[in-house]
Curated annotation (Swiss-Prot):
The keyword Protein biosynthesis applies. Belongs to the TRAFAC class translation factor GTPase superfamily. Classic translation factor GTPase family. EF-G/EF-2 subfamily. GTP binds at residues 17-24, 81-85, 135-138. Its main location: cytoplasm. It holds the Pfam family GTP_EFTU. GO terms for biological process: ribosome disassembly. The keyword Ion transport does not apply. InterPro entries: EFG_II, EFG_III, EFG_III/V, EFG_IV, EFG_V, EFG_V-like, EFTu-like_2, G_TR_CS. Keywords: Cytoplasm, Elongation factor, GTP-binding, Nucleotide-binding, Protein biosynthesis. It comes from Bacillus cytotoxicus (strain DSM 22905 / CIP 110041 / 391-98 / NVH 391-98). Residues 8-282 form the tr-type G domain. NCBIfam families: EF-G, PRK12740.1-3, PRK12740.1-5, PRK13351.1-1, small_GTP. The gene is fusA. This is Elongation factor G.
Length: 692
C-alpha cells in the first residue's frame, strides 16, 4: 500500500481552548466540511462527534482527546481534540507533545480566558506553532479587536489579524481577508453558500490600516520582506503568505482569524489557514532520542526511509476491541501484524490491527507512515509516554513527565461482586491515565485512589459505575500521618507467666532515642555475656518492629527511631521467642511516657501561578492554611508563589483557588517531608482516632 498523502500535505493539529469557547463545535464543523459527518451534532444537545464518552456528553465538556482524521483540499488533517478543564491539563500536555501545530479557539466576548493562559503556556513549553480562531462572533458582546488585544496583554503574544469581521453579533455576516484583499459574504446558516466579493467600500479604510500593520509585523521577522517594505515596493500575496508561514512555524508569530463555528461561518477559511500556515511534519525539527544502552543522543527525521519510531500518547479501553494505544509515528513505517520493541520498558510487542480513528467510528488500515497518528490494538505492556521502535534500531524518545497525584480518597465496593470487578477496573484506568493511581493501604486495608483534583476523581468514580458497572462508596480525603520520638530513655519490658507447668518468661532493657530524619527504624544489639541468649535477639527486634507499625499515640506508624537492646534476663525452661517478642512490645509501651512521642504530617511543596492582582488574596489564603511562603517570582505576566503547606490543609484547594482567581490560577504540589503537627491539632487527631 502506498502513501495516500505526502508528508508535505499532512497536518497534525490540536484544537485547544478554555471551557465553552466552542472548541468541540469547531472540530465538528471541520469534520462536516471535510465530508466525514453528514449531520452536525451540537454540543449542547449532547450529540457531538468528538465527545464520545457518556460523561462528556452529559457535562458538555471534553475529557478525552479523541484523535480524528479528515481531508481538505488534497491534505490529510489529523485533529486531536483537547480538554479545557484545569483537572485535565495532563490530557492537553499529552496531546501537545505529539502535535506539530494547534488552533487556539477564543470566545469573541471574553478573549483570552484563564485556561487559555495555562494551555498557551504548555504549548509554548513544547514549541507548538499556533493560529488563533476567534469564535462566537455571532454572540452578544462579541468584539474581535478586543479579543486580539487580550492576546497581547495577557499572553504577550505577537498576534496579528489576517481577517476582519464584517458586522458582529446578529449582524455578523462576512469576513474580510487581509492577505487575499477580498471579502467573503455568507448567505445562509449552513455556511455552504459563500460569495467572494471585493472589500465593501465602508470597510476599505480599516482593511488597509490592518493590512499595513500585518505586513509591518511580518516584515520585522523577514529581512528580504523588510527591504522591500522600506523601499516602498509592492509585496505580492504569495510573498506575504510565505513569510507568514515561515514566522508561524518558527513560533514567532500567531495569525488571528475569526468566525462562528455554530453558525458555520469562517470554518472553511480556518481549514485553509491550517494548511497555509501550520507546519507539516517536515517543517518541525527532527525529534531527539537516546540509544538505551549507550545514552548516545540520536535524531529521527520525518521520513519513511528511516527506522520506525513512535510515541504512545494515549491508552483507551474500547468496549468492542479492548485496549487501544494511540501513537504518533515520527519516522519509518509500520505494518499491522508486525513486531516492535517498546524501548522504554524493554519489551517486545506485536501490533495486531492498526486503526485510523474518526471520533467514534474506525477504519482498519494495513500500514502507517511517518507523520501519521493512529491507534494500535494488541499492545500489552505499553503505557502513555512509551516509545515504540524498530527492534534493530532502538531509541527512546523524550518521554512525557506527569505530575504526582495530589488528592486521594478511600473507595469501597458496595458488594462482593463489585469488589471482584473493581481491581481490574482500577488497573485499566491507571493504565489509561498516568496521573491516576490506585493502591491498597497496608494499615487500613482500604483501596485508595489518587488523582489531580476533585473533578478528576469524580469522573473516575463515574467511569467505574458506567463503563465497568462497579458501584462504590467514596470516603472523605485522607492524610497519611506518622509518629516519632523526640527524647531518649532507657525502659524495661518484662513478661512473666509462671504458675505451675511450663511458663513464659522474657525480660529486656531497651534504650530508645530519636534517629535522623528519613533513616527509619534502626535496631542494635548491645548484649554482653549472654544475659539474653543470641537466639532470642531476632524476636526482640521483630516484636519492636510490629509494635512500631501500630503506633503509640494515634495508631500511625512510628518512624525515625533507634533502639538498642542493652540488658535483660531469661529462664532456662520458660523463655521462648514469643515471650521476648511480647517483652519488647511492653518496653515500647513503657517508652511512651518518657520519650515524648509526637505526630508528624506530610508537608507539600506548593507552587501557585496567578495573575498579579490576586497576589494578596493568595498569600493570605496560604497563611490561613498553616502554610509558609518561601519565595515569589514573576513569570511572564503571572506571579509564582512557592510555599510549604500541610497536606491536610490542601483539600478543596483547587476549588478555592478557582473561585479566588475567577479560574485564572493554577497550582501544583509535591510531597516534600514530614513535620511535627502543632499540639492542638495533634490532640484532635488522637481524640478522633480513639473514637472520642
Amino acid at each position: 500500500m502506498t502513501r495516500e498523502f505526502s508528508l508535505e500535505n499532512t497536518r497534525n493539529i490540536g484544537i485547544m481552548a478554555h471551557i465553552d469557547a466552542g472548541k468541540t463545535t469547531a472540530t465538528e464543523r471541520i469534520l462536516y466540511y471535510t465530508g466525514r459527518i453528514h449531520k452536525i451534532g451540537e454540543t449542547h444537545e449532547g450529540a457531538s462527534q468528538m465527545d464520545w464518552m457518556e460523561q462528556e456528553q452529559e457535562r458538555g465538556i471534553t475529557i478525552t482527546s479523541a484523535a480524528t482524521t479528515a481531508q481538505w483540499k488534497g491534505h490529510r488533517v489529523n485533529i486531536i481534540d483537547t480538554p479545557g478543564h484545569v483537572d485535565f491539563t495532563v490530557e492537553v500536555e499529552r496531546s501537545l507533545r505529539v502535535l506539530d501545530g494547534a488552533v487556539a479557539v477564543l470566545d469573541a466576548q471574553s478573549g483570552v480566558e484563564p485556561q487559555t493562559e495555562t494551555v498557551w503556556r504548555q504549548a509554548t513549553t513544547y514549541g507548538v506553532p499556533r493560529i488563533v480562531f476567534v469564535n462566537k462572533m455571532d454572540k452578544i458582546g462579541a468584539d474581535f479587536l478586543y479579543s486580539v488585544g487580550t492576546l497581547h496583554d495577557r499572553l504577550q503574544a505577537n498576534a496579528h489579524p489576517l481577517q476582519l469581521p464584517i458586522g458582529a453579533e446578529d449582524e455578523f455576516n462576512g469576513i474580510i481577508d487581509l492577505v487575499e484583499e477580498c471579502a467573503y459574504m455568507y448567505a445562509n446558516d449552513l455556511g455552504t453558500d459563500i460569495e467572494r466579493i471585493e472589500i465593501p467600500e465602508e470597510h476599505q479604510e480599516l482593511a488597509a490600516e490592518y493590512r499595513g500593520k500585518l505586513i509591518e509585523a511580518v516584515a520585522e521577522l523577514d529581512e528580504e520582506l523588510m527591504m522591500k517594505y522600506l523601499e516602498g515596493e509592492e509585496i505580492s500575496k504569495e510573498e506575504l503568505k510565505a513569510a507568514i508561514r515561515k514566522a508561524t512555524t518558527s513560533v514567532e508569530f500567531f495569525p488571528v482569524i475569526c468566525g462562528s463555528a455554530f453558525k458555520n461561518k469562517g470554518v472553511q477559511l480556518m481549514l485553509d489557514a491550517v494548511i497555509d500556515y501550520l507546519p507539516s511534519p517536515l517543517d518541525v525539527p527532527a525529534i531527539k532520542g537516546i540509544v538505551p544502552d549507550t545514552d548516545e543522543e540520536v535524531e529521527r527525521h520525518s521520513s519513511d526511509e528511516e527506522p520506525f519510531s513512535a510515541l504512545a500518547f494515549k491508552i483507551m479501553t474500547d468496549p468492542y476491541v479492548g485496549k487501544l494505544t494511540f501513537f504518533r509515528v515520527y519516522s519509518g513505517t509500520l505494518n499491522s501484524g508486525s513486531y516492535v520493541k517498546n524501548s522504554t520498558k524493554g519489551k517486545r510487542e506485536r501490533v495486531g490491527r492498526i486503526l485510523q480513528m474518526h471520533a467514534n467510528s474506525r477504519e482498519e488500515i494495513s500500514t502507517v507512515y511517518a507523520g501519521d497518528i493512529a491507534a494500535a490494538v494488541g499492545l500489552k505492556d505499553t503505557t502513555t509516554g512509551d516509545t515504540l521502535c524498530d527492534e534493530k534500531n532502538l531509541v527512546i524518545l523524550e518521554s512525557m513527565e506527569f505530575p504526582e497525584p495530589v488528592i486521594s480518597v478511600a473507595i469501597e465496593p458496595k458488594s462482593k461482586a463489585d469488589q471482584d470487578k473493581m481491581g481490574t477496573a482500577l488497573a485499566k484506568l491507571s493504565e489509561e491515565d498516568p496521573t491516576f493511581r490506585a493502591h491498597t493501604d497496608q494499615e487500613t486495608g482500604q483501596t485508595i485512589i489518587a488523582g489531580m483534583g476533585e473533578l478528576h476523581l469524580d469522573i473516575i468514580v463515574d467511569r467505574l459505575r458506567r463503563e465497568f458497572k462497579v458501584e462504590a462508596n467514596v470516603g472523605a480525603p485522607q492524610v497519611a500521618y506518622r509518629e516519632t520520638f523526640r527524647a531518649a530513655a532507657k525502659v524495661e519490658g518484662k513478661f512473666a507467666r509462671q504458675s505451675g507447668g511450663r511458663g513464659q518468661f522474657g525480660h529486656v532493657w531497651i534504650e530508645f532515642e530519636p534517629n535522623e530524619e528519613g533513616k527509619g527504624f534502626e535496631f542494635e544489639n548491645k548484649i554482653v555475656g549472654g544475659v539474653v541468649p543470641r537466639e532470642y535477639i531476632p524476636a526482640v527486634q521483630a516484636g519492636l518492629e510490629d509494635a512500631l507499625q501500630n503506633g503509640v499515640l494515634a495508631g500511625y506508624p512510628v518512624i525515625d527511631v533507634k533502639a538498642a537492646l542493652v540488658d535483660g534476663s531469661y529462664h532456662d525452661v520458660d523463655s521462648s521467642e514469643m515471650a521476648f517478642k511480647i517483652a519488647a512490645s511492653m518496653a515500647l509501651k513503657a517508652a511512651v511516657s518518657k520519650c515524648n512521642p509526637v505526630i508528624l504530617e506530610p508537608m507539600m511543596k506548593v507552587e501557585v501561578v496567578i495573575p498579579e492582582e490576586y497576589m494578596g488574596d493568595i498569600m493570605g489564603d496560604v497563611t490561613s492554611r498553616r502554610g509558609r511562603v518561601e519565595g515569589m517570582e514573576a513569570r511572564g505576566n503571572a506571579q509564582v508563589v512557592r510555599a510549604m503547606v500541610p497536606l491536610s490543609e490542601m483539600f478543596g484547594y483547587a476549588t478555592a483557588l478557582r473561585s479566588n482567581t475567577q479560574g485564572r490560577g493554577t497550582f501544583s504540589m509535591v510531597f516534600d517531608h514530614y513535620e511535627e503537627v502543632p499540639r492542638s491539632i495533634s490532640e484532635e487527631i488522637i481524640k478522633k482516632n480513639k473514637g472520642e
